[in-house]
Amino acid sequence: RVSGVGVGKGGIESVQVAGEKDQMEISTRSFVIAAGPLLKQAGALIGMDFPVFNELHGKIAFNDPRGVIPRDVPLMIWTDPMKLPWTEEEREVLEGSDNTRWLLEEFPSGVHFRPEGGEGSQTILALWTYDIKPQEPVWPPVFDPEYAEIVLRGMAGMIPGLSVYLGKAGKPFVDGGYYCKTQENRPLIGPLPVRGAFVMGALSGFGIMASLAAGELLGNHVSGSALPDYAPAFLLSRYEDPEYKKLLQSWDATSGQL
């Protein structure tokens, strides 16, 4: 674990790494911050305050022994808001408590799923980020106790045949992590004001798709290689541009993300 960074008048000089029993110092002129949801904490080691925040994104895995969902379907996404399917009796119970009444309200779009595993697998992976308020990252992530039930009901609204599993799906496996994002949902890639320091982060909801190109762009910055014409679009210094600040007024943290 990086516990400290040595910075002199010429920029980065060393990195301190803490192990379970001891600590070592590595002499270096380059330091890349690619700490995912801990981008802010890592930046603070060199006095940087990155304009990022984190959203908690979860997923569930459950079995489909009845074969409601064909194994060869692609990733499927529901793009309309919806209300969760409940029986009249369930509605009455939920309506009777301030703690559960929100489950009767309209939920945002975005529930999606795909089959997981090879031949013989019955596993379905499903995701729905219906709560996108910023959160401080903790490990392990803590999910809403009702998350799995809500996702399954959202899928039943999308695929009515899945309603056979409501209340009968056993205990779905819940996992997930954080989306680190900037205000306009555009990554940070490039050099920092501290000489020798670089950042690659805030890849948000398209990290898998953008990671290869992001890594190549970062490598060009670090090695001093030729940069593509779009490189300035990802620099931290973009926030110093008055015209860019005006653009931010019409963008939000879901830009470019399903």
Regions found by a protein language model. Give the residues of each.
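Short beta-strand segments that buttress and anchor functional surface loops
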Residues: 14-19, 202
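Flavin (primarily FAD) binding-site architecture
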Residues: 33-48
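Core beta-strand elements of the Rossmann-like FAD/NAD(P) dinucleotide-binding domain
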Residues: 20-30
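Active-site lid/adjacent beta-loop-alpha segment flanking the redox-cofactor pocket in flavoenzymes
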Residues: 65-195
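C-terminal lid/capping helical subdomain adjacent to the catalytic/cofactor pocket in oxidative enzymes
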Residues: 192-258
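A conserved short coil-to-beta-strand element within the FAD-binding core of flavoproteins
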Residues: 1-13
